[in-house]
């Protein structure tokens, strides 16, 4: 080992190994598929509590729900929800 070495494998050795590509050829596409399913099924809206695109405006309320008074924000939010 050279001076100052941490004893870890060099990055070049890692990315040129067969084992690296066998593992990552499965895990990287799986992560993309999992993310796509998370968003496309709407689970992301449920987990993070954000409104779905068709829930931003209701039939009764078509204006932008913008808070204008920070001290009365709770009351304004309650009015927007109604």
UniProtKB/Swiss-Prot annotation:
List cystine links.
none
Q: What does this protein do?
A: This b-type cytochrome is tightly associated with the reaction center of photosystem II (PSII). PSII is a light-driven water:plastoquinone oxidoreductase that uses light energy to abstract electrons from H(2)O, generating O(2) and a proton gradient subsequently used for ATP formation. It consists of a core antenna complex that captures photons, and an electron transfer chain that converts photonic excitation into a charge separation.
| Subunit structure comment from the entry | Heterodimer of an alpha subunit and a beta subunit. PSII is composed of 1 copy each of membrane proteins PsbA, PsbB, PsbC, PsbD, PsbE, PsbF, PsbH, PsbI, PsbJ, PsbK, PsbL, PsbM, PsbT, PsbX, PsbY, PsbZ, Psb30/Ycf12, peripheral proteins PsbO, CyanoQ (PsbQ), PsbU, PsbV and a large number of cofactors. It forms dimeric complexes.
Location in or out of the cell:
Cellular thylakoid membrane
Q: Does the keyword Aminoacyl-tRNA synthetase apply?
A: no
Give me the residues that bind heme, please: 24
Q: What is the lineage of its organism?
A: Bacteria, Bacillati, Cyanobacteriota, Cyanophyceae, Oscillatoriophycideae
- Transmembrane stretches in the record are 22-36
Could you say which cofactors this protein requires?
heme b
Q: Which GO terms describe its cellular component?
A: photosystem II reaction center; plasma membrane-derived thylakoid membrane
Cofactor: how bound: With its partner (PsbF) binds heme. PSII binds additional chlorophylls, carotenoids and specific lipids.
Instruction: Tell me which family the UniProt entry assigns to this protein.
Output: Belongs to the PsbE/PsbF family.
Protein name (database record):
Cytochrome b559 subunit alpha
Q: Where is the signal peptide?
A: none
Q: Which GO terms describe its molecular function?
A: electron transfer activity; heme binding; iron ion binding
Fetch the PANTHER family from UniProt: CYTOCHROME B559 SUBUNIT BETA-RELATED
**Keywords tagged on the record:** Electron transport, Heme, Iron, Membrane, Metal-binding, Photosynthesis, Photosystem II, Thylakoid, Transmembrane, Transmembrane helix, Transport
- InterPro entries hit by this protein: PSII_cyt_b559_asu (IPR006217), PSII_cyt_b559_asu_sf (IPR037025), PSII_cyt_b559_CS (IPR006216), PSII_cyt_b559_N (IPR013081), PSII_cytb559_asu_lum (IPR013082)
State the membrane topology.
Single-pass membrane protein
Superkingdom to which the source organism belongs: Bacteria
Q: Which GO terms describe its biological process?
A: photosynthetic electron transport chain
Coiled coil start-end = none
Q: Which gene encodes it?
A: psbE
């Amino acid at each position: 080992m050279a001076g100052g070495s941490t004893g870890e494998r060099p990055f070049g050795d890692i990315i040129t190994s067969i084992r690296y590509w066998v593992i990552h050829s499965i895990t990287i596409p799986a992560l993309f598929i999992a993310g796509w399913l998370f968003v496309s099924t709407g689970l992301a809206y449920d987990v993070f509590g954000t409104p779905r695109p068709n829930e931003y405006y209701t039939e009764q309320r078509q204006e932008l729900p913008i808070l204008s008074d920070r001290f009365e924000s709770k009351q304004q939010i309650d009015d927007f929800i109604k």
